[in-house]
Amino acid sequence: AKDMISLGCKELDMVINVAALKSGMYDYVEQDIKAVVDAACGVPVKTIIEHGLLANDEIKRASEIGVKAGASFIKTGTGWVSGKPTTVETIRLIHETIGDAAKIKAAGGVRDLDTVLAMYDEGCTRFGLGVRSCRGILDEVAKRVAARG
């Protein structure tokens, strides 16, 4: 973390230890996140929970642990793990669990404007989008603005 900050990083992403979480090693997961948060010296840390590998109770637990350890964001995934795309329901579950204690970033499977707007309404403030998705979303925004006259 310190090396990345010295190179100019303004935010850090870290993937939680999913195996430890699934094994019930919650203190270990928390200490791991806290070590990165502490090393970041105030630089925001996003904890990536890889929701596609987790059951709902594990998503809630991972989100709680991230907040307790001082993470600035709970991020749904890296985009590298196959599984389920981020859904509005996942964002709602995370937001119901952590409230405003940390920000939420949706990543993986967010493909259209209606999904972005629904996730925003559920408390998500950041979105990890691919180029094709961005283009489609921006085209849809332009169409809706034009339709308003």
What are these regions (language model features)?
Residues 46-49, 75, 104-106, 128:
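Short catalytic-loop micro-motif centered on adjacent basic/acidic residues
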Residues 7-21, 68-84, 109-111, 115, ...:
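Glycine-rich phosphate-binding active-site loops on the catalytic face of alpha/beta enzymes
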Residues 1-3, 54-65, 92-96, 100-106, ...:
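Catalytic cores of alpha/beta
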Residues 25-32, 58, 62, 70, ...:
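General structural feature for long, well-ordered alpha-helical segments within catalytic domains
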Residues 31, 42-43, 100-103, 145-149:
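Short acidic, glycine/proline-enriched helix-loop-strand junctions
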Residues 33-41, 92-99, 142:
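Surface-exposed amphipathic alpha-helices with a cationic face
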Residues 1-72:
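Conserved anion-binding
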